[in-house]
Amino acid sequence: MAFLSLSSGDVTGFKVLFALLILYGLVSYLVHSVIHMKFIAPLGVNAPLDRFSEARAIEHVRVLAEQIGGRQEGSPGLRQAAVYIRTQLEQIKERAGSNIRIEIEETVVNGSFNMMFLGQSISLTYRNHTNILMRISSVDSQDSDPSVLLNGHFDTPPGSPGAASLLELARLTIDSGWTPPRPIIFLFNGAEELFMLYYGLQDDGLGSHGFMTTNRWRDTIGAFINVEASGTGGFDLVCQSGPGSWPSYTYSQSAVYPMATSAAQDVFGAIPGDTDYRMFANDYGDIPGLDIIFLLGGYFYHTSSDTVERLLPGSMQARGDNLFSLMKAFASSTKLLTAQQRESFGAAASGSKGESPVFFDYFAQFLVCRYLGLLLKKASPGVSQYSICDISPYASFIVLEKWEFILYL
């Protein structure tokens, strides 16, 4: 009988291979846990009122998706959803303290605009679209103060995590006892996906166009967060940011569960789809902001299988915690400016538009955020130790051997 004979080199090779397999398994498990939000415990309906609760947000989803059902433009369900959202906002207003001013508006918008789709220019005209707004501010604030906009649309097919997240977030803004240093505007727009229903992936953004062309607060918006969903949950990815570097930097400093990569912004440009981000940041506002989107489970997106039960546990909890922290960071920032102020200050208002932000998260634990611009200069003699240090909120440097690399944010 012949026996397999292994040399010492073969044994070492097998050990290395076995170690690599274990490492691969651990990394795969970690990545799967992060993508599916396994490390986040969603809070229930009885959670403290000063915390965002996924269970409370899902209650809104069930009303919108199951009790009301289809909410396509022109359907009775869309009007029922508007009534429900307005009712919830009025209830939130009743609980506000004496130091808070709340204004609720329901507006009907009309308009027209051109858009590019698959290389072709298309003209769209719309009438009688409903937008619902809630503006939360301190009693001593002015109408002209720069504000933060959070946008979500409620005209989706079954499932509406965007609008539901904002309802719970509006409640949290009041019940947390926080007094916003700058006004916060929640926009529930009722016409974002009309064009997509007929032509595939492209979204048209009629409601956001109506806001940007007619609303009295449009020129006060200093930053915005657009909440979207192209799936049933998972990591809440920042797929677009800008103009300038300020939005991505603010996200890197404030997100509780940072989930972002600058590569997503490059890929998104190649997809025949769009969001309300275009109306705010590019076509009509030039407003600094973020486009945040659910991606996992995209094969259920806009199908009959896009149900409440398919929402991944922990996804909306992570979204709510991130949005509340990010909203407070934007509202407290000195870079929050009105349209007139941005025009006066130019590129310095939110970071140069020529800057190219490069960022990525590390398993949703922290975000590495840097901006292109490299200066190389000679270090002092005798410096040989490798070190990484922060010298300002906008720069970091690496000292390696006798060369000092300064990477400007």
State the predicted function of each range.
Residues 12, 77, 398-399:
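Alpha-helix capping and helix-coil boundary motifs
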Residues 2-4, 21-30, 381-409:
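Alpha-helical transmembrane segments of integral membrane proteins
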Residues 1-6, 353-365, 392-395:
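Membrane-proximal N-terminal segments immediately preceding the first transmembrane helix
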Residues 5-44:
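Hydrophobic alpha-helical transmembrane signal-anchor segments
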Residues 2, 14, 19, 190, ...:
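Short amphipathic alpha-helical "recognition" segments used for binding
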Residues 9-15, 361-384:
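Juxtamembrane/start-of-transmembrane alpha-helix segments at the extracytoplasmic/lumenal side
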Residues 42-371:
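Soluble extramembrane regions of membrane proteins in the secretory/endomembrane system
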